[in-house]
């Protein structure tokens, strides 16, 4: 075989796509004039002959090999140019076929075929007939006999009811796998007649359900699926693959559009239960054994199209799989990272020390997006960015864009700057399939390809399901007023069930009478279910109080640890491998921790934290901590991950505790707040036994995730009964660093505090931090569990007055309030009680150490702000019979911090005729001064006012 005959040798394997086309053009030029090309190319052509096509390099089938052995590239420049053109045409069809595809069920978009016309490449059908199939479409089925057949085959595949975009996928193995699957038709379902009838039955159930709701509950919001009915069989197909592959958990996130239909038909929520929610009747009687979620009794509940559900399925091997539809607020797309967190938690085994073991095949996420929200909401890009990061990847998610080509009343030309709703995914190299929702079999094909790709490559996949919205945004909306052109077409357009039924009738697969009987059966089932729902609303009790265990205080949890245990753990945490080179300065800092259990110094904040973590792991509670720069700590205080200064190798001391009984991980998060916090919330919901902590770089940046605090963390239990023990660490304190590096917006968390929905604390000592972390770990699996919002310090991290003696760890516990030592000892003389919290308490303590004659003053630190320590403060006030004023002192402006929250509570419990007043910054629009000099003067003024006795 000469070099001119086809072979698989280098160097041509490094060329593909447009680059290969260029090299083939150069070869054509070389045949005419060898000296007209670059000397390097000339040498390659001389040595290796004609460039090999991608087809040759990646198809090793017997027929293709035979072609390569028998076909010799022509040296005639004209014939060779036709081959080059044919290869280019095939490539253009793969890249641009989607522009000409029949993917819009309303046919309202012009198809662009310019890039894939034969005339554009100076080709004729006769030219193509002379070219072997393998050069154009090596994966073509047997009926494709020549180049013309191959081009027609590619046109059919790439411009039909399903279209593909994968040129953004840079990995050659992935691209060629996609080409193989698509062009061979391997992914497309070959349904039996029985399966086609079953598919029609499913579409009949989907449509019948919506029509029944429309007739029965006139004008009530339901956000129907109509126009995207095929989404349900598409989900069915993904679920079928999952149970066959013995996946353990499938987690679904979606907004309101079509949610009730998915709840009924994918999650198995009984019709009766859904109808009861429309009827405002009791729905508890219809709770299935699988555990579908209804309105949560004892709380405020949520609207029916926000509720989630869970269902368990079994396959023939008795393998059980759990399907979960996440509870969801109306805030579009914000559930996405929550569902990813669910999935990572479901994939991991946290029962052993070290890093959790992860099995990405055991669970995956399906995210259903809106076509306006997918490009419009920034949380989408944030979440996509998590998909391949070590601390967040889940082995790929399947995204379905429920594309009805409109957002409320806004059409696509006003809602995005891209051609497709899915285009943002291209930046993450995610393959995209556009599919016409009026072709249910094509929708199943898209599901097959997505599942197979995710399984093989552990990466995300996007299905752009293009349909329409048969009615308005909700059932009280009239779309003809704002979108008359689109809706005049929709009103005349048959439903997907009607289209598919007609197709099966025409093929003789089913009779018209059988179709009508199918409709009657579905309608009868719905009617019977509706008749079971009670109609009398008068029996319902609308007084909804939280359950008693939650309404009460947190239970006592022993958080002190024996000194010998702490001493041993401390020693183990300071042991490194003999060949590990710790950074010199850091090594000196860590060495200081060695002597604290021998009376040499105190335990500072970061030291208390790592000891708390070590003891929690010893108790068998897994820990997951994430945040921006959290491994080291924003303020270089933590150092949970050490780096060898010669090799860069990492060492995590908490992985080497001798009696650790659970996993520990700490990840530096991407520069994202909302998606990461949502992810950690989701992780904690699915792994309730795990102490999950999220740390803001500065508390000021937590408001980038405000939607997560508002819609999930503070209210998730009241709306959905969804428990969480998530810990949020928000660095807070005024140190002259300006308005964006001073405030964790404490006031916002206190404003949201109600029904014991979380604990809000602002601590002043390392021991308090130790105990509150251990208390939180101790309540994780109790009914009283709740999130913990901690205003963490910056300047206190190394402050000697915030450090704690060993005895406070071995004999102490968490105290909601702490009285200032050395003050208030002469009870008769105390006239002023100052209440304060957090870092400002240390500012006052520092100044007090320089003063004398303070027997008229007492200072009380309120460490736990919510729940408010009413009884503890009342007991303190009662000890001082001559107190004249109770002052709340803070460094935050009057309209921020704790004052607005504590004022009415203090007035309620203050002794009669005792004035309650405020000292701090005046009301401000911005949290803090930008000038450090101005800050210092203002800070000094507040401290002086607080510590200066009033003149008589």
Curated annotation (Swiss-Prot):
Q: For this UniProt record, give its keywords in alphabetical order, as a comma-separated list.
A: Glycolysis, Oxidoreductase, Thiamine pyrophosphate
Under Gene3D superfamilies, the record lists:
3.40.50.12470, 3.40.50.970, Multifunctional 2-oxoglutarate metabolism enzyme, C-terminal domain, TPP helical domain
EC number(s) in its UniProt entry? Answer: 1.2.4.2
Q: Which GO terms describe its biological process?
A: glycolytic process; tricarboxylic acid cycle
Q: Taxonomically, which superkingdom? A: Bacteria
PANTHER family referenced in this protein's UniProt entry, alphabetically: 2-OXOADIPATE DEHYDROGENASE COMPLEX COMPONENT E1 (PTHR23152:SF4), 2-OXOGLUTARATE DEHYDROGENASE (PTHR23152)
Please report the name of this protein according to its UniProt entry: 2-oxoglutarate dehydrogenase E1 component
Q: Which organism is this entry from?
A: Geobacillus sp. (strain WCH70)
**Upper lineage:** Bacteria, Bacillati, Bacillota, Bacilli, Bacillales
């Amino acid at each position: 075989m000469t070099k001119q005959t086809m072979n698989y040798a280098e160097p041509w394997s490094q060329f593909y796509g447009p680059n290969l086309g260029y090299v083939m053009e150069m070869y054509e030029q070389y045949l005419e004039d060898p000296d007209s090309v670059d000397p390097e190319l000339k040498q390659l052509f001389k040595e290796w002959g004609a460039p090999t096509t991608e087809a040759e390099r990646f198809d090793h089938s017997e027929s293709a090999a035979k072609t390569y052995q028998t076909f010799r590239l022509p040296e005639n420049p004209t014939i060779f140019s036709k081959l080059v053109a044919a290869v280019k045409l095939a490539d253009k069809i793969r890249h641009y076929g989607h522009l000409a595809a029949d993917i819009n069920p309303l046919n309202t978009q012009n198809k662009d075929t310019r890039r894939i016309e034969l005339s554009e490449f100076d080709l004729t059908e006769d030219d193509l007939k002379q070219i072997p199939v393998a050069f154009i479409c090596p994966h073509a089925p047997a009926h494709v006999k020549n180049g013309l057949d191959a081009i027609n085959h590619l046109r059919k595949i790439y411009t039909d009811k399903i279209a593909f975009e994968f040129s953004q996928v840079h990995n050659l193995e992935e691209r060629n796998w996609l080409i193989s699957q698509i062009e061979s038709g391997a992914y497309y379902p070959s349904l039996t007649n029985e399966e086609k009838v079953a598919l029609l039955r499913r579409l009949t159930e989907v449509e019948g359900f919506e029509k029944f709701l429309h007739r029965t509950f006139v004008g009530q919001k339901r956000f129907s699926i109509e126009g995207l009915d095929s989404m349900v069989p598409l989900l069915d197909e993904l679920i079928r693959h999952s149970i066959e592959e013995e996946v353990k958990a499938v987690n679904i996130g979606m907004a309101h559009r079509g949610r009730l239909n998915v709840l009924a038909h994918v999650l198995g929520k009984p019709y009766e239960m859904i109808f009861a929610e429309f009827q405002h009747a009791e729905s508890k009687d219809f709770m299935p054994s699988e555990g579908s979620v209804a309105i949560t009794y004892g709380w405020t509940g949520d609207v029916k199209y926000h509720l989630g559900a869970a269902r368990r399925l079994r396959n023939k091997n008795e393998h059980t799989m759990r399907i979960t539809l996440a509870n969801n607020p109306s805030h579009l797309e914000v559930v996405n990272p929550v569902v990813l967190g669910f999935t990572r938690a479901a994939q991991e085994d946290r029962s052993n020390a070290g890093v959790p073991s992860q099995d990405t095949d055991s669970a995956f996420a399906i995210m259903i997006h809106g076509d306006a929200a997918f490009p419009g909401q920034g949380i989408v890009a944030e979440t996509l960015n998590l998909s391949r990061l070590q601390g967040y990847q889940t082995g790929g998610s399947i995204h379905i864009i429920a594309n009805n080509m409109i957002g409320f009343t806004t059409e696509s030309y006003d809602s995005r700057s891209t051609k497709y709703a899915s285009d943002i995914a291209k930046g993450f190299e995610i393959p995209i399939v556009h599919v016409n929702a009026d072709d249910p079999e094509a929708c199943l094909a898209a599901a097959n390809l997505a599942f197979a790709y995710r399984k093989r490559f552990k990466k995300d996949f996007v299905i752009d399901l293009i349909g329409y919205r048969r009615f308005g945004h909700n059932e009280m909306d009239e779309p003809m007023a704002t979108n008359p052109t689109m809706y005049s077409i929709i009103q005349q357009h048959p439903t997907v069930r009607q289209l598919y039924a007609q197709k099966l009738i025409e093929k003789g697969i089913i009779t018209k009478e059988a179709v009508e009987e199918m409709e009657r059966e579905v309608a009868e089932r719905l009617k019977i279910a509706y008749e079971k729902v009670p109609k009398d609303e008068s029996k319902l009790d609308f007084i909804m109080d939280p359950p008693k265990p939650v309404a009460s205080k947190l239970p006592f949890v022993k958080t002190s640890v024996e000194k010998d245990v702490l001493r041993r753990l401390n020693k183990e945490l300071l042991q490194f491998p003999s060949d590990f080179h710790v950074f010199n300065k850091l090594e000196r800092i860590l060495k200081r921790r060695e002597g604290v259990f021998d009376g040499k110094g105190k335990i500072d904040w970061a030291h208390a934290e790592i000891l708390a973590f070590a003891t929690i792991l010893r108790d068998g509670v897994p820990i997951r901590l994430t945040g921006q720069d959290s491994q080291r700590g924003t303020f270089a205080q933590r150092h949970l991950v050490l780096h060898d200064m010669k090799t860069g190798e990492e060492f995590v001391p908490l992985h080497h505790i001798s009696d650790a009984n659970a996993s520990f991980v700490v990840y530096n998060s991407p520069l994202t707040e909302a998606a990461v916090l949502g992810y950690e919330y989701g992780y904690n919901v699915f792994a309730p036994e795990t102490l999950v902590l999220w740390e803001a770089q500065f508390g000021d940046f937590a408001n980038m995730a405000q939607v997560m605090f508002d819609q999930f963390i503070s209210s998730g239990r009241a709306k959905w009964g969804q428990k969480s023990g998530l810990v949020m660490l928000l660095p807070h304190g005024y140190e002259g660093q300006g308005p964006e590096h001073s405030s964790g917006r404490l006031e916002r968390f206190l404003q949201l505090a109600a029904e014991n929905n979380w604990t809000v604390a602002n601590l002043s000592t390392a021991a308090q931090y130790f105990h509150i972390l251990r208390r939180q770990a101790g309540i994780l699996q109790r009914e009283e569990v709740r999130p913990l919002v901690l205003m963490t310090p910056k300047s206190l991290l190394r402050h000697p007055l915030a450090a704690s003696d060993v005895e406070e760890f071995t004999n102490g516990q968490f105290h909601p309030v702490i009285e200032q030592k050395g003050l208030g000892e002469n009870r008769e003389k105390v006239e002023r009680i100052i209440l304060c919290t957090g870092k400002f308490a240390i500012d006052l303590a520092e100044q007090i150490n320089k003063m004398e004659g303070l027997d008229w003053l007492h200072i009380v630190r309120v460490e736990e702000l919510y729940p408010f320590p009413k009884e503890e403060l009342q007991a303190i006030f009662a000890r001082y019979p001559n107190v004249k004023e109770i002052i709340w002192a803070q460094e935050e402006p009057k309209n921020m911090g704790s004052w607005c929250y504590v004022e009415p509570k203090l007035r309620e419990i203050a002794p009669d005729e005792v004035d309650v007043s405020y000292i701090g910054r005046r009301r401000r629009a911005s949290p803090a001064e930008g000038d450090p000099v101005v800050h210092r003067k203002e800070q000094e003024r507040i401290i002086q006012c607080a510590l200066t006795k009033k003149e008589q």
